[in-house]
Protein backbone atom coordinates (compact mmCIF):
# COMPACT_ATOMS: atom_id res chain seq x y z
CA UNK A 1 0.00 0.00 0.00
CA UNK A 2 2.87 2.36 0.74
CA UNK A 3 4.24 1.79 -2.77
CA UNK A 4 0.80 2.38 -4.29
CA UNK A 5 0.44 5.63 -2.38
CA UNK A 6 3.87 6.79 -3.46
CA UNK A 7 3.80 5.90 -7.14
CA UNK A 8 0.11 6.21 -7.98
CA UNK A 9 -0.80 9.28 -5.95
CA UNK A 10 -0.27 11.71 -8.82
CA UNK A 11 -2.04 9.66 -11.50
CA UNK A 12 -5.46 10.95 -10.49
CA UNK A 13 -4.10 14.47 -10.97
CA UNK A 14 -2.74 13.74 -14.45
CA UNK A 15 0.74 12.44 -13.69
CA UNK A 16 2.12 9.97 -16.25
CA UNK A 17 3.35 6.52 -15.28
CA UNK A 18 5.27 4.90 -18.15
CA UNK A 19 6.85 1.48 -18.62
CA UNK A 20 10.35 0.62 -19.86
CA UNK A 21 10.01 -3.04 -20.85
CA UNK A 22 11.59 -3.70 -24.26
CA UNK A 23 15.30 -3.79 -25.04
CA UNK A 24 17.35 -3.51 -28.25
CA UNK A 25 16.58 -6.67 -30.23
CA UNK A 26 14.22 -8.05 -27.58
CA UNK A 27 10.54 -7.17 -27.29
CA UNK A 28 9.13 -7.57 -23.77
CA UNK A 29 11.86 -10.03 -22.66
CA UNK A 30 11.09 -12.20 -19.63
CA UNK A 31 14.84 -12.35 -18.94
CA UNK A 32 15.94 -8.74 -19.42
CA UNK A 33 19.57 -7.83 -20.03
CA UNK A 34 19.02 -4.81 -17.78
CA UNK A 35 20.57 -5.58 -14.40
CA UNK A 36 19.64 -4.66 -10.85
CA UNK A 37 22.57 -5.53 -8.62
CA UNK A 38 23.51 -4.01 -5.29
CA UNK A 39 20.85 -1.35 -5.60
CA UNK A 40 22.21 -0.15 -8.97
CA UNK A 41 20.24 -0.28 -12.22
CA UNK A 42 22.13 -0.64 -15.51
CA UNK A 43 20.88 -1.24 -19.04
CA UNK A 44 19.03 0.20 -22.01
CA UNK A 45 15.31 0.17 -22.75
CA UNK A 46 13.65 1.15 -26.02
CA UNK A 47 10.17 2.16 -27.19
CA UNK A 48 9.42 3.91 -23.90
CA UNK A 49 6.41 6.21 -24.37
CA UNK A 50 6.33 9.67 -22.79
CA UNK A 51 9.47 8.99 -20.75
CA UNK A 52 10.37 12.67 -20.62
CA UNK A 53 6.97 13.68 -19.24
CA UNK A 54 6.58 10.71 -16.88
CA UNK A 55 6.68 11.05 -13.13
CA UNK A 56 7.89 7.45 -12.81
CA UNK A 57 9.18 4.66 -15.05
CA UNK A 58 8.41 1.00 -14.37
CA UNK A 59 11.56 -0.88 -15.37
CA UNK A 60 11.93 -4.66 -15.74
CA UNK A 61 15.34 -6.02 -14.77
CA UNK A 62 17.00 -9.40 -14.33
CA UNK A 63 16.21 -9.66 -10.63
CA UNK A 64 12.92 -7.81 -10.37
CA UNK A 65 10.85 -4.79 -11.30
CA UNK A 66 11.84 -1.34 -10.08
CA UNK A 67 10.29 2.12 -10.28
CA UNK A 68 12.64 5.03 -10.99
CA UNK A 69 12.32 8.69 -11.85
CA UNK A 70 13.31 9.71 -15.40
CA UNK A 71 15.15 12.65 -13.86
CA UNK A 72 17.28 10.51 -11.52
CA UNK A 73 21.06 10.66 -11.77
CA UNK A 74 22.34 8.22 -14.39
CA UNK A 75 19.18 8.22 -16.53
CA UNK A 76 19.66 9.38 -20.13
CA UNK A 77 16.74 9.89 -22.51
CA UNK A 78 17.10 9.80 -26.30
CA UNK A 79 14.06 10.70 -28.38
CA UNK A 80 13.24 8.16 -31.11
CA UNK A 81 10.77 8.40 -34.03
CA UNK A 82 7.27 6.93 -33.92
CA UNK A 83 4.69 6.51 -36.68
CA UNK A 84 2.10 8.43 -34.68
CA UNK A 85 4.50 11.31 -34.06
CA UNK A 86 4.07 10.75 -30.33
CA UNK A 87 6.82 11.08 -27.75
CA UNK A 88 8.92 7.93 -27.58
CA UNK A 89 12.37 7.41 -26.10
CA UNK A 90 15.29 5.06 -25.66
CA UNK A 91 16.32 5.17 -22.00
CA UNK A 92 19.78 4.29 -20.74
CA UNK A 93 20.37 3.55 -17.05
CA UNK A 94 23.92 3.87 -15.74
CA UNK A 95 24.40 3.01 -12.07
CA UNK A 96 20.99 4.47 -11.24
CA UNK A 97 20.29 4.19 -7.53
CA UNK A 98 17.29 1.94 -6.87
CA UNK A 99 15.96 2.34 -3.37
CA UNK A 100 14.76 -0.87 -1.67
CA UNK A 101 11.23 0.53 -1.35
CA UNK A 102 11.21 1.23 -5.11
CA UNK A 103 11.53 -2.47 -5.96
CA UNK A 104 8.03 -3.87 -6.48
CA UNK A 105 7.59 -6.75 -4.07
CA UNK A 106 6.50 -9.99 -5.72
CA UNK A 107 6.60 -8.52 -9.24
CA UNK A 108 8.44 -10.22 -12.10
CA UNK A 109 9.28 -9.25 -15.66
CA UNK A 110 7.13 -12.14 -16.90
CA UNK A 111 4.03 -10.94 -15.08
CA UNK A 112 4.51 -7.30 -16.07
CA UNK A 113 4.96 -8.36 -19.71
CA UNK A 114 1.78 -10.45 -19.55
CA UNK A 115 -0.24 -7.45 -18.39
CA UNK A 116 1.43 -5.15 -20.91
CA UNK A 117 0.69 -7.48 -23.85
CA UNK A 118 -2.91 -7.89 -22.70
CA UNK A 119 -3.34 -4.10 -22.61
CA UNK A 120 -1.64 -3.67 -25.99
CA UNK A 121 -3.91 -6.33 -27.48
CA UNK A 122 -7.05 -4.65 -26.18
CA UNK A 123 -5.87 -1.28 -27.48
CA UNK A 124 -5.09 -2.74 -30.91
CA UNK A 125 -8.46 -4.52 -31.06
CA UNK A 126 -10.15 -1.18 -30.44
CA UNK A 127 -8.04 0.53 -33.11
CA UNK A 128 -8.91 -2.10 -35.74
CA UNK A 129 -12.60 -1.95 -34.79
CA UNK A 130 -12.49 1.84 -35.10
CA UNK A 131 -10.86 1.67 -38.53
CA UNK A 132 -13.46 -0.89 -39.63
CA UNK A 133 -16.33 1.35 -38.53
CA UNK A 134 -14.78 4.39 -40.20
CA UNK A 135 -14.26 2.49 -43.45
CA UNK A 136 -17.73 0.90 -43.44
CA UNK A 137 -19.33 4.32 -43.01
CA UNK A 138 -17.20 5.74 -45.81
CA UNK A 139 -17.99 3.08 -48.43
CA UNK A 140 -21.68 3.15 -47.46
CA UNK A 141 -21.91 6.87 -48.22
CA UNK A 142 -19.38 7.29 -51.04
CA UNK A 143 -20.97 6.74 -54.44
CA UNK A 144 -19.43 5.67 -57.74
CA UNK A 145 -21.35 4.94 -60.94
CA UNK A 146 -24.55 6.01 -59.20
CA UNK A 147 -24.38 3.52 -56.33
CA UNK A 148 -22.64 3.25 -52.93
CA UNK A 149 -19.22 1.63 -52.96
CA UNK A 150 -20.41 -0.86 -50.35
CA UNK A 151 -22.74 -2.46 -52.89
CA UNK A 152 -19.84 -3.60 -55.08
CA UNK A 153 -18.98 -7.26 -54.45
CA UNK A 154 -15.21 -6.74 -54.27
CA UNK A 155 -15.56 -3.91 -51.76
CA UNK A 156 -17.93 -5.98 -49.61
CA UNK A 157 -15.54 -8.95 -49.70
CA UNK A 158 -12.55 -6.83 -48.66
CA UNK A 159 -14.52 -5.26 -45.84
CA UNK A 160 -15.56 -8.73 -44.71
CA UNK A 161 -11.88 -9.68 -44.40
CA UNK A 162 -11.33 -6.66 -42.17
CA UNK A 163 -14.34 -7.66 -40.06
CA UNK A 164 -13.00 -11.21 -39.60
CA UNK A 165 -9.59 -9.94 -38.51
CA UNK A 166 -11.20 -7.42 -36.16
CA UNK A 167 -13.44 -9.99 -34.47
CA UNK A 168 -10.70 -12.61 -34.09
CA UNK A 169 -8.32 -10.03 -32.62
CA UNK A 170 -11.02 -8.97 -30.15
CA UNK A 171 -11.66 -12.63 -29.27
CA UNK A 172 -7.97 -13.28 -28.64
CA UNK A 173 -7.75 -10.13 -26.52
CA UNK A 174 -10.83 -10.98 -24.46
CA UNK A 175 -9.61 -14.54 -23.92
CA UNK A 176 -6.27 -13.30 -22.57
CA UNK A 177 -7.87 -10.76 -20.25
CA UNK A 178 -10.33 -13.32 -18.90
CA UNK A 179 -7.64 -15.92 -18.26
CA UNK A 180 -5.41 -13.41 -16.47
CA UNK A 181 -8.27 -12.09 -14.35
CA UNK A 182 -9.32 -15.65 -13.46
CA UNK A 183 -5.80 -16.62 -12.44
CA UNK A 184 -5.44 -19.15 -15.27
CA UNK A 185 -2.41 -19.88 -17.43
CA UNK A 186 -2.51 -17.38 -20.30
CA UNK A 187 0.90 -17.89 -21.93
CA UNK A 188 -0.40 -19.73 -25.01
CA UNK A 189 -3.21 -17.23 -25.51
CA UNK A 190 -0.80 -14.32 -25.13
CA UNK A 191 1.50 -15.74 -27.79
CA UNK A 192 -1.44 -16.16 -30.16
CA UNK A 193 -2.61 -12.62 -29.42
CA UNK A 194 0.84 -11.18 -30.11
CA UNK A 195 1.17 -13.05 -33.39
CA UNK A 196 -2.36 -12.31 -34.58
CA UNK A 197 -1.97 -8.60 -33.83
CA UNK A 198 1.36 -8.24 -35.62
CA UNK A 199 0.46 -10.43 -38.61
CA UNK A 200 -3.16 -9.44 -39.24
CA UNK A 201 -3.70 -5.88 -38.02
CA UNK A 202 -1.25 -4.14 -40.43
CA UNK A 203 -2.66 -5.80 -43.61
CA UNK A 204 -6.26 -4.96 -42.73
CA UNK A 205 -5.22 -1.37 -42.08
CA UNK A 206 -3.79 -1.31 -45.60
CA UNK A 207 -7.13 -2.62 -46.87
CA UNK A 208 -8.96 0.16 -45.04
CA UNK A 209 -6.65 2.72 -46.64
CA UNK A 210 -7.26 1.15 -50.05
CA UNK A 211 -11.04 1.27 -49.62
CA UNK A 212 -10.81 4.95 -48.72
CA UNK A 213 -8.98 5.75 -51.95
CA UNK A 214 -7.15 9.07 -51.82
CA UNK A 215 -9.11 10.14 -48.74
CA UNK A 216 -7.19 7.62 -46.66
CA UNK A 217 -3.94 9.48 -47.31
CA UNK A 218 -5.30 12.85 -46.16
CA UNK A 219 -3.73 13.69 -42.79
CA UNK A 220 -6.77 15.80 -41.87
CA UNK A 221 -8.85 12.61 -42.06
CA UNK A 222 -8.54 10.21 -39.06
CA UNK A 223 -7.74 6.96 -40.93
CA UNK A 224 -3.98 7.51 -40.78
CA UNK A 225 -4.11 7.71 -36.97
CA UNK A 226 -5.46 4.18 -36.70
CA UNK A 227 -2.82 2.83 -39.08
CA UNK A 228 0.03 4.70 -37.38
CA UNK A 229 -1.05 3.33 -34.02
CA UNK A 230 -1.06 -0.24 -35.32
CA UNK A 231 2.38 0.23 -36.91
CA UNK A 232 3.83 1.42 -33.60
CA UNK A 233 2.20 -1.43 -31.64
CA UNK A 234 3.49 -3.98 -34.16
CA UNK A 235 7.01 -2.59 -33.79
CA UNK A 236 6.68 -2.61 -30.00
CA UNK A 237 5.85 -6.32 -30.09
CA UNK A 238 8.77 -7.19 -32.36
CA UNK A 239 6.88 -7.92 -35.59
CA UNK A 240 5.14 -11.08 -36.89
CA UNK A 241 8.27 -13.22 -37.43
CA UNK A 242 9.44 -12.67 -33.86
CA UNK A 243 5.97 -13.43 -32.51
CA UNK A 244 5.64 -16.55 -34.65
CA UNK A 245 8.92 -17.82 -33.21
CA UNK A 246 7.43 -17.49 -29.72
CA UNK A 247 4.35 -19.46 -30.77
CA UNK A 248 6.60 -22.16 -32.24
CA UNK A 249 8.67 -22.30 -29.05
CA UNK A 250 5.51 -22.88 -27.01
CA UNK A 251 4.40 -25.66 -29.36
CA UNK A 252 7.78 -27.43 -29.25
CA UNK A 253 7.94 -27.25 -25.45
CA UNK A 254 4.49 -28.81 -24.92
What do these predicted regions represent?
Residues 1-18:
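FAD-binding glycine-rich core of flavoenzymes that anchor FAD
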Residues 13-15, 30-32, 52-55, 62, ...:
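A generic structural signal for well-ordered coil/turn residues at beta-strand boundaries
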Residues 13-26, 59:
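A short, Trp-centered hydrophobic/proline-enriched beta-strand micro-motif
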Residues 14, 40, 114-254:
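Alpha-helical interface subdomain recognition
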Residues 28-42:
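Cytochrome P450 C-terminal beta-domain/meander region
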Residues 31, 47-48, 70-108:
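Flexible, small-/acidic-enriched active-site or ligand-binding loops
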Residues 44-76:
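A short core secondary-structure module
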Residues 59, 66, 91, 128, ...:
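Residue-level signal for inorganic ion chemistry
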